[in-house]
């Protein structure tokens, strides 16, 4: 899969339960539209969406399950349970929260990865990280690639976005690890996506700027309310 998406665009087709497009059918059609637009892969949330998308398109899928736990801030494929559920849907790669935040049940990231490798040694794993340190740890633990997915979404990185300072975090991660680095998070224009690849990102994931009409509409309405002088 990593070779298939190299130097190309992956589209994140996700809609949570509180969003208007929440539907496996709709996400599968969104994936079809992304494929027609030239996407090289899809990032999908939930078993139902992953299965529906794989029936609709031939593109490789990065699967994940977002599941909240009252005792932890980690919610992207947080435990072995979610991995087991996803394996049945057969995504080409599974994404996990690889931040250093406390995990559900007190399990460590190292323990989770060891458990995954013991059962599915050939499974491709993507580490969703928020810092350079987390990227380095993910590489040491044997992840196949890292994504900048959670930069700006942890307590330590709140208020930051990936594009700031000409993608400083992306540059730092690229310099720190040898495994593929996937740029993801607030990559909301074609120019920013191209910049990520020019800097050396293995691939770039774009989500809301393509697949969340409410966010796209908000950008227009905000601009109309505050026109440039």
Which stretches of residues belong to each language-model region?
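Conserved N-terminal beta1-alpha1 strand-loop-helix module at the mouth
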Residues: 1-88, 125, 133-145, 225
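C-terminal alpha-helical cap/extension of soluble enzyme domains
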Residues: 1-2, 7-28, 163-229
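A short, structure-level motif marking secondary-structure boundaries and short turns
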Residues: 9, 14-17, 35-36, 67-68, ...
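Glycine-rich phosphate-binding active-site loops on the catalytic face of alpha/beta enzymes
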Residues: 14-16, 65-70, 89-103, 145-158, ...
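Active-site-adjacent beta->alpha loops and helix N-cap segments on the catalytic face
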Residues: 20-24, 43-62, 73-81, 98-116, ...
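Glycine-enriched alpha-helix->loop->beta-strand junction motifs that scaffold or abut catalytic
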Residues: 38, 57-61, 89-93, 119-122, ...
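Conserved hydrophobic beta-strand within the GNAT/NAT acetyltransferase core sheet
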Residues: 44, 125-127, 181-185
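P-loop/Walker A phosphate-binding loop and immediately adjacent motor/lid segment at beta-alpha junctions
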Residues: 110-111, 117-122, 179, 225-228
């Amino acid at each position: 899969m990593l070779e298939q998406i190299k130097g190309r665009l992956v589209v994140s087709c996700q809609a949570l339960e509180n969003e208007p497009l929440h539907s496996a059918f709709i996400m599968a059609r969104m994936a079809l539209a992304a494929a027609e637009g030239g996407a090289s892969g899809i990032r999908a949330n939930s078993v139902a969406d992953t299965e529906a998308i794989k029936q609709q398109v031939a593109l490789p899928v990065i699967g994940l399950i977002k599941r909240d736990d009252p005792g932890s801030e980690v919610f992207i494929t947080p435990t072995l349970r979610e991995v087991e559920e996803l394996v049945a849907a057969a995504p080409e790669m599974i994404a996990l929260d690889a931040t250093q935040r406390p995990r559900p049940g007190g399990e460590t990231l190292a323990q989770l990865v060891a458990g995954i490798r013991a059962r599915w040694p050939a499974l491709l794993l993507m580490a969703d990280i928020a810092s350079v340190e987390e990227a380095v740890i993910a590489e040491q633990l044997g992840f196949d690639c890292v994504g900048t997915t959670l930069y700006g979404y942890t307590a330590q990185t709140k208020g930051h976005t990936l594009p700031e300072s000409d993608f400083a975090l992306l540059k730092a991660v690229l310099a720190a690890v040898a495994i593929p680095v996937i740029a993801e998070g607030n990559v909301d224009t074609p120019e920013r996506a191209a910049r990520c690849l020019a800097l050396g990102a293995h691939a770039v994931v774009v989500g809301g700027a393509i697949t969340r009409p409410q966010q796209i509409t908000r950008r227009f309405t905000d601009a109309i309310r505050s026109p440039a002088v």
